[in-house]
């Protein structure tokens, strides 16, 4: 809030561009280029040619001294509900009329509003939660989540989550994402 107030003293709202740090990554930005600068994809990017979509955010590190944070957040809130949902929206959205931030935002909101809502019995069929255990990463030993600093020894906080979602629109009807 303080940063917003400081920025608004110098710039008007239309001159301020807020972006999630994850969305600023080159790979994420390239999704829009891949989708909309290559017209060949438009006729193929739909339920008639795509059986399913998988979006991964893989990491080779653990929580890296963020035990207190992760114990209250977990992977679902840390990664899925913001970063990965935005990626899903970029992958599934319709072509924006322009690449203006407001227009892209409006198209991503349409996707998110089209996500099929789960009923209670849908959750066990469509959600997997897990934790990483001790092992190796890049040839080096790593501890499991329960052995990380500031993590409760009986914690059930997820460090891995997988969701199967559906977007109820003409393009993605019946395609699991």
Please describe what each predicted stretch is.
Residues 2-177:
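Secretory/organelle targeting and membrane-embedding segments
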């Amino acid at each position: 809030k303080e940063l917003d107030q400081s920025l608004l003293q110098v710039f008007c709202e239309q001159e301020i561009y807020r972006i999630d740090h994850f969305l600023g990554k080159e790979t994420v930005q390239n999704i829009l280029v891949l989708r909309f600068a290559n017209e060949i994809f438009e006729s193929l990017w739909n339920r008639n040619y795509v059986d399913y979509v998988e979006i991964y955010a893989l990491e080779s590190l653990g929580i890296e001294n963020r035990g207190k944070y992760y114990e209250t957040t977990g992977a679902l809130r840390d990664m899925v509900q913001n970063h990965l949902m935005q990626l899903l929206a970029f992958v599934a959205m319709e072509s924006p009329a322009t690449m203006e931030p407001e227009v892209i935002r409006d198209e991503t909101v349409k996707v998110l509003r089209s996500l099929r809502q789960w009923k209670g019995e849908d959750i066990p069929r469509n959600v997997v939660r897990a934790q990483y255990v001790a092992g190796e990463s890049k040839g080096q030993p790593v501890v499991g989540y329960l052995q990380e600093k500031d993590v409760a020894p009986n914690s059930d906080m997820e460090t891995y989550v997988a969701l199967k979602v559906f977007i109820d629109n003409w393009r993605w009807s019946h395609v699991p994402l």
